[in-house]
Amino acid sequence: LRTENYVTYTPSSSVSPVVSYGSNVVDKQTVYSMAKGLERGGERVLSGINGDYFVMATGDPLGLVVTDGVLRSSASYLNALGFNADGSAVIGTPNLSLMAAFKGNNLKIADINKIRTANGFYLFTDDFASTTKNTQAGVDVILAPNTEGQELKIGTTVSCTVEEVIEAKGATSIPQGKFVMSISNKAGEWLQETIRSLEVGDT
């Protein structure tokens, strides 16, 4: 015998959907703890549902996370659930193009706020965690947005200035309001050389 519980939701001004991920995207918070966090902020939570799969060991979300139009964690091969301004829902496969332009090159960013692999450039924001959580050596570049407080809004370009280039042996701290572009020492040599060519003050 199987029992199913469900909630019937009709969009209205008094009831609206909220996407929550805790204090950062690898927090591994439960639905209950996220609901409590929202209620501490003055919201009244009527219902909640687990919205993504994640890697148990790291908390790395497998899917896309976007709140307030800001890309918190990227993914472009899994279906995603989204909500329009009127509260209605849409389900589909996102088609993200993530690029970094520097030194005359337009280079694909492998992922944003995902555990780094050797597959290319990764970009981290303070939505990810306090550090990059990298466990192997690589190169990390601290980037400051030229417009203070600018975030990774979907469909926009963010211009940054290089603050530091680090030959990192492991995790690098992610400064509040800034970004870390990262590549593994096991990635392609040309990609490593390209990021190592960056200097403090470059944009």
Regions from the PLM with identified roles:
Residues I195-T203:
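Loop/turn positions that initiate beta-strands
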Residues L1-N185, T194:
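Zymogen propeptides
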Residues G188-E189:
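Signal that preferentially marks extracellular ectodomain short beta-strand elements
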